[in-house]
Amino acid sequence: MASTGASKSSKPPRSPRHSIIMQGFDKLPIISKDHVSSTAKGSLTPQIGGEDVNFYNDAYFQLVRKRFCIPTDVVESKEICNWDKMKPSEGKGGDAMLFTPDRKYIIKELGSDHPTLLNITKEYVEHVCGDSLLVRFAFHFYRCSNKKNYVVMNSWLPGPDEEHLDKKGFQEDQYQSVFDLKGCADDKMMVRGGKTLEQVHKRCWHCKLKCSKGNQARKNYKNAKVYARKCDFMLHFDERKRLMSKIQSDAQFLRKQGLMDYSLIVGVKQCPINVFKEKYLKKNKDGKIMNGGFSGGDIHGRDQKQPYYSVHDGQVYAYYIGIIDFLQFYNTGKKVAHYIKCCDIKPLATVRPTVYGTRFEDYFSQKFKVTKENTPEWLKVGGISDLNNDG
């Protein structure tokens, strides 16, 4: 398949909004590795989950909040951020995390990733305020009550819009599949067929799994991993072009920072095209499609807006996409892991950042393919593609 994305040396143009927000960026304070009290002079940052916390380099993260219209008090109340409900994630790191009720934001504990974010704060903020798929850190803070570090970030898989909360009436507006993809043997699925998959990892200390075929949950998990590795995603030419320009730009940035082991998270919704038109596209009195679609993902500008839509084989597909878990330097621990896993299934996740980033670009350039079907009018002009504009 011929590549339709931007060349690896090109970068997507900066939006006017990015230029305005980043004025005076070089005059911001020097990056500090110390947390600063929320009552510091000039600070307008609120509590998190009803607790006073101390913030890291908030002059920078204010720019992220401004760029992406994230309210300063987005997780201020206990109702939105209930610390008692925070629990370990199912990922290998197992860092504790909590979704807000609308699933638009995540509060996540930072363990070994904390010093990495401190080291790249300035570069990260400048990059993410452009056109990027990197997860947006709105706050980086220290929780005094348990002496741990956290971030507040956006979720690339938000819950349904308020008008689609009725799951029976709008069952199509649910994620049918969720993928966590690295371009290596670690590719996996978290949701398949609309059902959450139990993450049954095969570890050397799980003797029953090592010495037997394992239970049904393990088989389902393994089969889903194989599918995640082999499946393709179909997009129309323009949709694929704007997606790949971001993936390439982000991979270049992460390589430059010496980061690796990150993932592309992909949430997929789908339904027959006739159902989509009838239930999700809104028309005026003349029958012209005005707006509508599945619940929104990223809404900041035409080049940023999500989901990415395509029509293929009579189905409408909506893709919600972002890059997560990128705060990993290729340190001594990763180098040791590389040699320990040298006999493991290839390709490996623990490789040098230059290798990882190049492979990441190439893998998704092949995985996101151009559908042969024509782009529908509701996606090209006058339809849902024009709903969201910078401003």
Language-model regions, residue ranges each:
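Polybasic, positively charged surfaces/segments
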Residues: 1-391
